[in-house]
């Protein structure tokens, strides 16, 4: 049995620094209005595990059966991102996974003009608000829905944290049949 099984396990921890990124906290006194310089200041940690199992057996002289499976878990985190001095801690990216999903928290739908008039002003979102539109939560309590009301919706993003697969290959003489199934988990997609 052990001559027919091949198992591979890898752990990885990758710490990258001096990543090229656009400066966001550059003082305006230096004359960079709206266009800040690029600099090698970013820092990211990427870590996880990979497991692969392969079983191969020859049955008689004409049949070969091969079964394989794999599993990968990956997690990353910004250790340092040059960010502006945000007024609220929930707006920062440092210490969070890459490409987290941020957005507004929906409180339901507006049902009347009176409800719209008594809700936080959403006009900065660019639409003429009418009954039936989504009403968003005023996170910072300033009476207006702005980019400062965006929060972390999920630490998952469109890049899956878990990937897996199962495969089977059967060969008889010079004819072979193979099938492979793969999937992913721990991801979110905004639609």
Where do the model's predicted regions map?
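C-terminal beta-signal and adjacent terminal beta-strands/loops
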Residues: 171-191
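Generic alpha-helix detector with strongest preference for long hydrophobic helices that associate
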Residues: 32-34, 50, 149, 156, ...
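Conserved small-residue
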Residues: 56-158, 189
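Active-site proximal loops enriched in glycine and acidic residues that flank catalytic Cys/His/Asp
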Residues: 10-13, 55, 149, 179-185
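Extracellular/periplasmic, surface-exposed regions of secreted and cell-surface proteins
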Residues: 1-101, 173
């Amino acid at each position: 049995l052990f001559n027919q099984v091949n198992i591979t396990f890898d752990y990885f921890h990758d710490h990258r620094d001096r990543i090229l990124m656009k400066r966001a906290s550059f003082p305006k006194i230096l004359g960079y209005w709206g266009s800040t310089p690029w600099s090698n200041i970013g820092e990211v940690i990427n870590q996880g595990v990979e497991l692969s199992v392969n079983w191969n057996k020859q049955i008689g002289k004409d049949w070969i059966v091969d079964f394989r499976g794999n599993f990968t878990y990956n997690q990353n985190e910004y250790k340092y991102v040059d960010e502006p001095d945000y007024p609220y801690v929930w707006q920062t990216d440092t210490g969070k996974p890459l490409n987290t999903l941020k957005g507004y928290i929906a409180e339901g739908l507006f049902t009347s003009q009176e409800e719209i008039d008594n809700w936080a002003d959403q006009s900065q979102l660019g639409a003429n608000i009418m009954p039936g539109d989504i009403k968003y939560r005023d996170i910072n309590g300033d009476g207006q829905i702005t980019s400062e009301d965006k929060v972390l919706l999920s630490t998952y993003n469109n890049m899956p944290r878990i990937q897996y697969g199962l495969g089977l290959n059967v060969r008889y003489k010079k004819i072979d049949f193979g099938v492979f199934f793969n999937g992913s988990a721990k991801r979110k997609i905004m639609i």
